Amino acid sequence: MSALRAVFLLAALALTAAPVHAQQSQQSLRMWFIDMEGGGATLFVSPTGETLLVDTGNGGQNATRDANRILDAMRDAGVTRIDHLVTTHWHGDHYGAMREVAGRVPIAHFIDHGPTVETAQAAVDFLRDVYPTLYQGARHTVAQPGDRIDVRGLDITVMTSAKRVTDRPVQGGGAANPYCAGFTPQEEDMGENAQSVGIHVRFGEFRLLHLGDLTVNTEYELMCPNNPIGSVDLWVVSHHGQPISNAAVLVHAIEPRVAIMNNGTRKGGQPAAMQVIHSAPGLEDLWQLHFSQLSGQEYTVPGVFIANGLDEQLEAMPIAPITPPTGRGGPPAPAHNGQAYWIEVSARPDGSFTVTNARNGFTKEYR
C-alpha cells in the first residue's frame, strides 16, 4: 500500500468513526450524582445535550466547595450551561451554592415550589434579596404537580410540589397500591421537606424517580390508594436515606432495580430506612455517595458501591451503626473536604443502564 493511499484510508476511518461515537452519545441519558456531603446535586444531560440540575448543595463556608464540585461534573459532561435548575426545597443543603453556581455558568430556567414555609433567616434573606436577582432575565416557574419540564428526548413530570401531589399517573402507573394498608403515619411535617418538588423522568423504557426530601405522610398521599408511578429502574433515595422519609408504601411499591443514596459521613443511612430499602422487592443494588456511620457495616453496602471516604481514613469501619448525636453539642461528623467522587449513570432507551463509581472505576451493567 502506498503512503498516500494509507493517509487517505486513515482519514476515511476517522471520518466514519466520529459519527458512531456521536451517535452513541446521542442515544444516552447521562447523570452525575455529585457528592455534596449529605446535600443534594444531580446533573442530567439529555441525548440532545440539554441539561437539568436538581439542587445545588450546601451554602455558607461550603458553598465554594460544592459549586466547584458541580462545575467539575459539568466539565466532565462537556456542558457549559444549565437549561433547567430544579430546587426541590429551601433547605441550605439543597440550594446553598446556587449563587456561586449561577455566578459561573448561565442558568436559563429556575424551578421551585414557591416561597419557603419556614422562618430560617438564611432562606428568608436569600429568597428576598438574592434569588430574584438570579432569575431576573431568565425563566422562573413555580412548579405544580402534573407539570412537564421541557427537555427534548425526555418526559419529565412533576409528581409533587408544595405538599401537593399529582392526580394523574405517568405511563405504567395507576394500579392499586397493596402497601397502603400497612402504612403508619408519622407526626405531620409542616416544614420544607414535605414541600419538595419531586420528578419522574422517562427516557424510552428507562424510568427514574427523584422526590427530594419528601417525607412519609406526603409519600402516602402520593402513593395511595393507587400507585401513580408504577415501577422504576433507578430511584434516588429520598432525604439522604433518613427514616422520616422512605416509607415502604413508596419504596416497595415502585420496585426500584437500583437505588442511589446521596448521604453524608454521618447523615442518612439510619437502620430503619436501610431496612426498608434493602427489602424493596426487585432491588438489585444500592449505591452510596458515602459510607455512613449511622449504618455501620451492619446495613451498608460493599465498598465497590461507595463513592467517597474520609479525609482521615479510619483503620476500621464500625460494624454496628451509631446513634446520631442530638442538639448542637455533639462532635462534628467525620470530615471529607478533599477529592470528591461522583456516581455516573448512562441510560439507554431500551431501559438498560450502566452505573460507574468514579472513585474506583467499578462499573455494573443493568439490562
Please state what every model-predicted region is.
Residues 6-17:
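Bacterial N-terminal signal peptides
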Residues 1-3:
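N-terminal secretory signal peptides that target proteins for export/translocation
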Residues 21-367:
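Non-globular, low-confidence helical/coil segments that flank catalytic cores
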